[in-house]
Every structure is written in structure tokens, then in C-alpha cells.
UniProtKB/Swiss-Prot annotation:
Gene Ontology BP term (one): dGTP catabolic process
CDD domains with a match to the protein in the record: HDc (cd00077)
GO terms of molecular function: dGTPase activity
Annotated SMART domains: HDc
UniProt cross-references to InterPro entries, sorted A to Z: dGTPase, dGTPase-like, dNTPase_2, HD/PDEase_dom, HD_domain, PHydrolase_assoc_dom
Full protein name: Deoxyguanosinetriphosphate triphosphohydrolase-like protein
Length: 404
């Protein structure tokens, strides 16, 4: 199939007309499919708008041209739709999952997540996937009939399982959850709306997951180049980018550094999308899933890179870890950001009157457990933008690091 050509809807794609529905029954839309409605609800949500001022690596005032969680999510959605289109999957569901996958991230990226996880270590910790589920099922207050966005089962499943099953069929935790168990928020919601935590996710969710990796790799290279953390020639230590750069230099001799870097990022995205599609087609031919449920019960992810592309992608991640994520400038900022989150949490824990009125407990906290109380504080902080967290820290402590 030519790259970019849309395939007919596949038998293994999620069918909006066969959706497992929503937790709360609603009348169907006359003009939009259930998955299109999910996508639109995410776009119009408060949590999605806040992503504009939540960073991944750089803090918000480092520069207007660096990526935020919002721009990253939009880029993931574009890549995910491109892959879904070629595989005959439901593009609306794929887009909804791509746009929703980061809703649970706290301010300051992984630094904020580490801090909140430490603050809640005795009470289940903090997991951004569980927090994304909490946002779309409880913390959004936009509709009169229910809390959350009342998304379809397929979208909720994908938010939770886009990186693979959480348990085996017996309920034993798998992967990253083996040490501390599946997050309480996911377990509790699963009791009322079974997401089949033991099974693999739909192909649409798997596509959103690999699109996230592609976007991270390419766009963190772009941001790192813009920030001067490394140059295009430094990327020559990896065979894939060395070959791409050499080919660019032959086609465009004397190209200025900014355009040279931008062309490399474009070629990298194109290569990774093509590699993902080619391997997915190979695996789908081998597995021959006749339905979306056959995909879930395949026993393996079907959207993956082939070994050679996976090795190249792993080298990119290792390069970014050395030259960007652990760069002294970035590490210094992230250390200060963690301190801001730690101090905000401790302040609200010890002085609950400092919380906004809408975040104070109902009935003066009667019947609220300590775990519930601390989770409420966590939910408030996790919803903050970088800017609001710094402003709130300044208000409470009158001394806030500049995060530069």
C-alpha cells in the first residue's frame, strides 16, 4: 500500500456502531459517531486546555517555541491518525486516545510525577495513566448528569491499556505494576466498568502508544537542537541519524543549521511511521485477527517496531537521556520543580485552609479517610499548570525558584 493511502475499514478495527457503550446511557448523536464525540469531548475539556501550560522537559517560560503537553498531544494525534489510516483502523478513536493520553500528567513533567508519587507512597502512589482515567471519569465537571466525560468503553480501555495488559487472567499485576500493584483508581473503576485489564488493547490504542514514542523521539530532538543542548553533528553517533544527515547534506549542500535539523526531524518521523506500519502489516498477516476481540486476545501487541527499527529507536532514547534529560541545565530545573511540588503538597496537607474552597472536603471532611484526603490534595496539584504551580508557591511561600 502506498504511504498515506487510506485502507478500507479492517475487520479488526473498532467499530463505533458496535461500541460497548458508556457508563451512563446517553442518546446517540445524529451527526457524530461515539468515538468522534469522545474526541470532541476531550478537546473541549478543561484538562486538555491546561496541557497548554504543562511542560515535558523545559519549563513554560524557557521559550514559546518549545513543546508543551498540548502541542505534543496534537503531534501524537497527527502521527496516530496517519498510521491508523494506512491500517484501516478507526481514526476518530485513535485520535481521541492520542489526545487523552497525557491528561493525567502533573505540572513539570516527570519531575512533578516523581514528587507526587513520593508524597503518596503509603497510599498507592501516583500514576499518570491512573490519573488520566480519574480526570475523564471523575474530575471533569462539565455535564449535569455525571462527573467526568462519560467516554466510551473503548476510549477508557485505551487510556488505561495503551502500553499493554495490566494483569494476567488471574488478576496478578504485570510489568511496571508487579512491584506495587495496579493503581487503586484503576482497580476501583474497573469494578463498575470492566476494562478487561488482562487483555491487550485495541489496535487503535496500540497505535496511539507507538505514535507517542515517535513524537517524543523526533520532537525532543527538535527541542534539544533549538535549546543548543546538542547539534545535528552530535546525532551522528547513531547510525540511523548519521545516514539521514549524510543524505540531507548531499541533497541540500550548505543548508543552514536550523533547516538541516528540521529536515532531519521530518525524515525521522517518516521513517518511524513507515517502520511501524510495515511491521504492523507483517504481524497482522501472521496473526490474522478476525475481530477486535481477537486482537485483544492475541497474547501480544501487534503494533510494534521490527527489531532493527526498535534498536535504532532505543539508541535515540539513550542519546536523548544522555544529552537532554540528564543535561545539567535540565536536571537543575527539574530538581527545583520537584521541590515546588513537594512543598505545595506539604503545605496543603498541614494547612488545608490554604486550598481553594472548591477543593475543600464536603461535610467538613466527615467520613473522609487519610488516603482520600491526600488523594484530593494530589488531584488538585496534578491539575495545575506549571505557571499556576509557581504562582501558588509564590503566594504561599513568597520565595519560588525561577526554574531557569
Amino acid at each position: 500500500m502506498s504511504v498515506g493511502m487510506a485502507a478500507p475499514r479492517a475487520a479488526f478495527a473498532c467499530d463505533p456502531d458496535a461500541s460497548r457503550g458508556r457508563l451512563f446511557d446517553e442518546l446517540p448523536s445524529k451527526t457524530r459517531s461515539p468515538f468522534r464525540r469522545d474526541c470532541d469531548r476531550v478537546i473541549h475539556s478543561t484538562g486538555f486546555r491546561r496541557l497548554k501550560h504543562k511542560t515535558q522537559v523545559f519549563v513554560y517560560h524557557e521559550g514559546d517555541h518549545y513543546r508543551t503537553r498540548l502541542t505534543h498531544s496534537l503531534e501524537v494525534a497527527q502521527i496516530a491518525r496517519a498510521i491508523a489510516r494506512q491500517l484501516g483502523l478507526d481514526e476518530d478513536l485513535t485520535e481521541a486516545l492520542a489526545l487523552a493520553h497525557d491528561l493525567g500528567h502533573p505540572p513539570f513533567g516527570h519531575a512533578g510525577e516523581r514528587a507526587l508519587d513520593a508524597c503518596l507512597q503509603r497510599y498507592g502512589g501516583f500514576d499518570h495513566n491512573a490519573q488520566s482515567l480519574r480526570v475523564v471519569t471523575a474530575l471533569e465537571h462539565r455535564y449535569p448528569e455525571f462527573n467526568g466525560l462519560n467516554l466510551t468503553w473503548e476510549t477508557l480501555e485505551g487510556i488505561v491499556k495503551h502500553n499493554g495488559p495490566l494483569t494476567d487472567r488471574s488478576g496478578a499485576p504485570l510489568g511496571r505494576y508487579q512491584a506495587h500493584g495496579v493503581p487503586t483508581g484503576i482497580v476501583e473503576f474497573n469494578r463498575c466498568f470492566d476494562l478487561e485489564l488482562w487483555s491487550h488493547a485495541s489496535l487503535e490504542a496500540q497505535v496511539a502508544g507507538i505514535a507517542d514514542d515517535i513524537a517524543y523521539d523526533a520532537h525532543d530532538i527538535d527541542d534539544g537542537l533549538r535549546a543548543g543542548l546538542f547539534g545535528v553533528d552530535d546525532l551522528g553517533e547513531m547510525p540511523l541519524t548519521a545516514q539521514m544527515t549524510a543524505a540531507i547534506d548531499v541533497r541540500y549542500p550548505g543548508l543552514d543549521p536550523a533547516r538541516r535539523g528540521a529536515e532531519l526531524v521530518r525524515e525521522l518521523i517518516s521513517f518511524l511511521i513507515g517502520a511501524a506500519v510495515a511491521e504492523a502489516e507483517r504481524r497482522l498477516i501472521a496473526a490474522q485477527p478476525a475481530s477486535v476481540q481477537a486482537v485483544r486476545e492475541a497474547g501480544q501487541d501487534l503494533i510494534m517496531f521490527a527489531p532493527d527499527a526498535a534498536e535504532a529507536e532505543a539508541l535515540i532514547k539513550a542519546f536523548l537521556k544522555r544529552h537532554m534529560y540528564r543535561h545539567p541545565r535540565v536536571m537543575r530545573v527539574m530538581d527545583d520543580a520537584e521541590t515546588v511540588v513537594f512543598e505545595l503538597f506539604a503545605r496543603y496537607r498541614d494547612h488545608p485552609a490554604d486550598l481553594p474552597a472548591e477543593w475543600l472536603p464536603a461535610n467538613a471532611g466527615q467520613g473522609e479517610t487519610e488516603a482520600d484526603r491526600l488523594r484530593r490534595i494530589c488531584n488538585f496539584i496534578a491539575g495545575m499548570t506549571d505557571r499556576y504551580a509557581l504562582t501558588e508557591h509564590q503566594r504561599l511561600f513568597d520565595l519560588t525558584p525561577e526554574l531557569r
